[in-house]
Amino acid sequence: MTRHFFGDTAVLLGRSLRHITRSPDTIITTAIMPIAMMLMFVYVFGGAINTGSVSYVNYLLPGILLITVASGIAYTAFRLFIDMKGGIFERFQSMPIARSSVLWAHVLTSLVANSISLVVVVLVALLMGFRSAAGVPAWLAVAGILILFTLALTWLAVIPGLSAKSVEGASAFSYPLIFLPFLSSAFVPTDTMPGLVRAFAEHQPVTSIVNAIRALFTQQPVGADIWIALAWCVGILIVTFAFAMNTYHRKIS
């Protein structure tokens, strides 16, 4: 059974990746908005924001990476919705394949596509002056956090992808996720925010994830932020996975 699951997932993953390679505009579109935001904030607003001794592009990049992921998962919900409405799921049910492999293929496709978009954003940031003296372990830690964050949000995307009534509804859920970094330490230090906004910003998941990635990039002590970030990512992943699988089983039953 396990062997069939991995084999079926690999085949379906190949199918999804072929769709992406035939329309690379998906990845380009995902990366364009975060890159445009990075350009605007660095070159238009960056001079007015005090981030201490850290250059603004270095300060900003962790938040932009999270926005890139939040933008990318909308396409996961979109692809799931199209497959669901197109009868692909019913066709797969009539075949001798592991049922959960269909969802895992979409999730892994999201992970691959978002990883490519993240690399593109980092390359643009390097052209804009981003520099990090972080070693290989720190970069691997950043990659691990981003992978967990992507998986958590992708399983969240599965839920509207399966249950939405329209294609617009399937992808619209990502809008609040894209907005969330604006109420965090992603763009400005939280100590510059008004009381209630600051309280919210300091206790929502994006701030701890951004702070952990920023500390890793700048080789500063990560403190408790990395554990809080991991707890948020793992917690969201567990909850969204459970809800997504429940939604999927209800849909195919």
What are these regions (language model features)?
Residues 36-41, 57-128, 148, 173-176, ...:
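Hydrophobic alpha-helical transmembrane segments of multi-pass membrane transport proteins
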Residues 41-50, 71, 125-133, 137, ...:
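Short helix-capping/hinge motifs at transmembrane helix termini and TM-loop junctions
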Residues 1-13, 153, 196-207:
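Short, membrane-interfacial amphipathic segments enriched in basic
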Residues 1-33:
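Aromatic- and glycine-rich beta-strand/loop motifs that create alpha-glucan
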Residues 19, 50-51, 133, 184-239:
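Membrane-interfacial helix-loop-helix junctions in multi-pass membrane proteins
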Residues 99-174, 221-245:
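Alpha-helical transmembrane segments and their short interhelical loops
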Residues 246-253:
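Short cytosolic juxtamembrane segments of multi-pass membrane proteins
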Residues 41-48, 161-203, 207:
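Transmembrane helix segments
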